[in-house]
Amino acid sequence: MLDIHNPATDHHDMRDLTIIGGGPTGIFAAFQCGMNNISCRIIESMPQLGGQLAALYPEKHIYDVAGFPEVPAIDLVESLWAQAERYNPDVVLNETVTKYTKLDDGTFETRTNTGNVYRSRAVLIAAGLGAFEPRKLPQLGNIDHLTGSSVYYAVKSVEDFKGKRVVIVGGGDSALDWTVGLIKNAASVTLVHRGHEFQGHGKTAHEVERARANGTIDVYLETEVASIEESNGVLTRVHLRSSDGSKWTVEADRLLILIGFKSNLGPLARWDLELYENALVVDSHMKTSVDGLYAAGDIAYYPGKLKIIQTGLSEATMAVRHSLSYIKPGEKIRNVFSSVKMAKEKKAAEAGNATENKAE
């Protein structure tokens, strides 16, 4: 978990921008606020920053972020925070924004489930997919008593699967990634997918097929989990059934179900903002249907949208940049070059240190 050294100050204090959501997009937006010399406050519903990357996939490796050939999810989150932290953004954790009000002077109040009200000149919604919960296998009934001990919906620690017989359900990126990722640690890995081909990234799918060909893993396509067996609250077997009626039984200690998540906008759906399916419609400036209220990341929609981390980081940059004309109306917006800004900050810091040393 990230060590946050700058918790929010008095919630009555005005900030230039309220950022709803502390995932990668929200954190990078805070950095961009610092780059553009505006103050911000991140409000995150979870007990830590990082969104799904920190809460669900901290050990998952990511390969499609510019400049990182390969990076564990939690390391990416920590790197993003290291960038943002230098500008001391306020951070509010464990609070969910339930309502916003646009005042007559054009500023905003955002109210959370705790009753706190936060004030800002503009708002950026970077809440990812909203509230999310894993998709389950309805045919298994209520298996909540096994969740976190034998049945998992995400990999938070590889140690949970070390030396275990693991059955993975799914055919997308997460299922394929962890099929490959757990080979070295698990006693055995069995992948079960109800489709006839994988939907995950081609490179990873090729690695899975190669592992299957050399006998490292077992793969069952066009097959579903029919039922499971347990003994004294511990998983022992997984029963499979194929589309042609064939049946198999696999000895197992862990069932890892990776078939996606159900998202829910929650209070956001009642905010009288233009929606497209389960996302907020934005224009080319990342502005929603309300002036002064922007959206970025997975929660934002426009034609041709790609829901990947890289896109969210770019959208955060655009949203903050374009919010300046609303936050500081009439002021000329100048391009900010990071190398120039950092050099000036470093020079100012050195000058300050020299002055302190001279005074001593």
UniProtKB/Swiss-Prot annotation:
Keywords: FAD, Flavoprotein, NADP, Oxidoreductase. GO terms for molecular function: ferredoxin-NADP+ reductase activity; flavin adenine dinucleotide binding; NADP binding. FAD binds at T25, E44, Q52, Y57, V97, F132, D298, S339. It catalyses: 2 reduced [2Fe-2S]-[ferredoxin] + NADP(+) + H(+) = 2 oxidized [2Fe-2S]-[ferredoxin] + NADPH. It comes from the Bacteria. Binds 1 FAD per subunit. The keyword Protease does not apply. Its cofactor is FAD. Its EC number is 1.18.1.2. PANTHER family: THIOREDOXIN REDUCTASE 1-RELATED-RELATED. Belongs to the ferredoxin--NADP reductase type 2 family. Homodimer. This is Ferredoxin--NADP reductase. The lineage of its organism: Bacteria, Pseudomonadati, Chlorobiota, Chlorobiia, Chlorobiales.
